[in-house]
């Protein structure tokens, strides 16, 4: 799962790191992000999330967390370090306004769906991530996100490696690794209705 992370760190930092963010246009800044998140919205590694069409405030808040060190990531920390508040707001708006890409992830098999739905009911994920897992202003969209990214994120909450949201840590600790895998596969294969409420 983590085999390519070291290579990505070199590519994203050595090649794409912004040196003078305030002097860069939004297109130049977005090109930096595309180094890992993909020029067409499809990330180059499945453990990296899609950010096209993701919620603006969520994107902005994650950049802030990386910048102040509350969320740890060797790739993201040096990328966001030189960004100003204006830069981060512009990037969040830019990516939020782009169309969510088709990541070509199939719907989960019936047995996986059954296991995922059984796990979802007591977790009440819809209570925060909305009826179709489309997210809201604060919470991210989960439907159609990268399978391996969802798996890694939920696993990190489960183990406590990621602890920025104590509520998520508690929820993920309440289920086992098999249920987490089923959830990731199920959510990754979901498509949103045309106008989700």
Would you name each region that the model predicts?
Residues 66, 94-95, 120, 157, ...:
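Conserved hydrophobic/aromatic "anchor" residues
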Residues 81-104, 148, 173-197:
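C-terminal capping alpha-helices of c-type cytochrome domains
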Residues 12-20:
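C-terminal segment of classical bacterial N-terminal signal peptides
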Residues 26, 41-71, 77-82, 126, ...:
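Gly/Gly-Pro-rich "capping" loops immediately C-terminal to redox-active cysteine motifs
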Residues 42-43, 97-112, 131-141, 158-165, ...:
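Inter-heme linker and motif-flanking segments adjacent to c-type heme-binding CXXCH motifs
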Residues 5-12:
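Sec-dependent N-terminal signal peptides
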Residues 21-40, 107-131, 146:
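Sequence/structural segment immediately N-terminal to covalent heme-attachment motifs in c-type
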């Amino acid at each position: 799962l983590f085999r390519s992370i070291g290579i990505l760190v070199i590519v994203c930092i050595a090649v794409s790191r912004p040196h003078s963010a305030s002097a860069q246009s939004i297109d130049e800044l977005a090109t930096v992000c595309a180094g890992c998140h993909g020029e067409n919205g499809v990330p180059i590694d499945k453990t990296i999330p899609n950010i096209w069409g993701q919620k603006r405030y969520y994107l902005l808040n994650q950049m802030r967390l990386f910048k102040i060190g509350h969320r740890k990531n060797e790739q993201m920390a040096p990328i966001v370090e030189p960004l100003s508040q204006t830069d981060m707001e512009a990037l969040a708006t830019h990516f939020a306004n782009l169309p969510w890409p088709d990541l070509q992830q199939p719907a989960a098999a019936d047995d996986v769906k059954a296991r995922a739905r059984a796990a979802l009911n007591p977790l009440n994920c819809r209570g925060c991530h909305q009826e179709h897992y489309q997210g809201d202003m604060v919470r991210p969209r989960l439907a159609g996100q990268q399978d391996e990214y969802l798996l890694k994120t939920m696993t990190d909450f489960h183990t406590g490696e990621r602890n920025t949201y104590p509520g998520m840590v508690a929820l993920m600790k309440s289920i086992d690794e098999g249920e987490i895998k089923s959830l990731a596969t199920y959510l990754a294969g979901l498509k949103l209705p045309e106008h989700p409420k």
